[in-house]
Amino acid sequence: MQRHSNQRLAHLVFSRACITVLLLAFALLIPAACAQTYDLSTLPAYPADADKPQIHGVIRIHGTELTQHLIHLWEDGFLKQHPLVRFGDYMLPSGFSGLTAGTADINVMGHTAWRSDLTAFEGAFGYDPFEVMFATGGFNLRKGNTPAAIIFVNRDNPLTGLTIKQLDGIFGAERSGGWIGTRWSTASARPASENIRTWGQLGLTGEWKDQPIHLYGIDATLSNWSELIQRVVFKGGDKWNPAMNEIVRGGVEVPADAQIVSSVATDKYGIGFNLMRVVEKNPGVKPLAIAANPDGPYVVPSSRSCYDRSYPLVNAVYLYINRKPGTPIEPTLKQFLIYTLSREGQQAVVEDGMFIPLNPEADARELQKLQ
């Protein structure tokens, strides 16, 4: 559905006002301790009137239902600064094609772009789309999305943590290489001898030593977590341990996430990946700390370790534009991107409640990319 900001209809304004009132009313029910989790005071404020350029034009944004509310918050805040700018929005289940077809200026994704999207774009233009991380994925937010991948085991398992290399050995398989964007690299190849299939290979002794590791996870063919694990753990590879019990989302009796967690809770030798707000509800399992390097440190998954991005399996959400390498970003578009990364833009991320705002270091890196 297209929304033209230069023709704000009365019923749309009324609807937004009603939604705002309802959100404010709900916020009153939330304990004060949860009202403000992140300190945004060190993020750069959007420039004052005297310091920002006077711009106008139309920005066409493609997004999804998951990002629609956040996009509207950004637009409303930006229009207060630049009233001559207009927006055209299209909210689609999969909207990356708009960037490739030239019908969108910005694509706001609830995840990183799939390789098929990148391949199509590169085929059309000969270079990769320009990527900006605008928030960190959720952790255990009430309506959070794109959450970190939590690795968990049965509560009786003596393990407390695993390294990324060990996770590769457990969940992965022999591979000849991996994808870096749309390019295949043999740098991430590994032999079958690095597979980890028993608990004894992780140093467990006694009754655990010769027991096989039972894997549980979401269908590895297409999911946000699967993509994250392939990118971070498998170094771009896409070969999984064929023994994994893949549970497909869409079941009518028990949600797949709950099935995965309950399976590990009843399987002493099980291990799985899922989101924290499901894992923490089941006392039969425990999350593991994860280390990016063999010598540590091991980082416990938490809201704080996701915010500072020290947890190795933290997720993120991105927006994309068509920027030819070595060329400047169109001024109106650049100002909107700056706004999304400003203190005001990141406050909108907090208000939206889907994602975690960027920490100052991550925010500064993304702003630098716009120069």
Region spans (language model):
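Intrinsically disordered, low-complexity repeat segments enriched in small/polar residues
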Residues: 9, 22-23, 33, 88
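Bacterial N-terminal signal peptides
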Residues: 16-31
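N-terminal secretory signal peptides that target proteins for export/translocation
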Residues: 1-14
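Flexible loop/hinge segments at secondary-structure junctions
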Residues: 35-371
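Hydrophobic alpha-helical segments, principally membrane-spanning helices and signal/leader peptides
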Residues: 15-16, 327
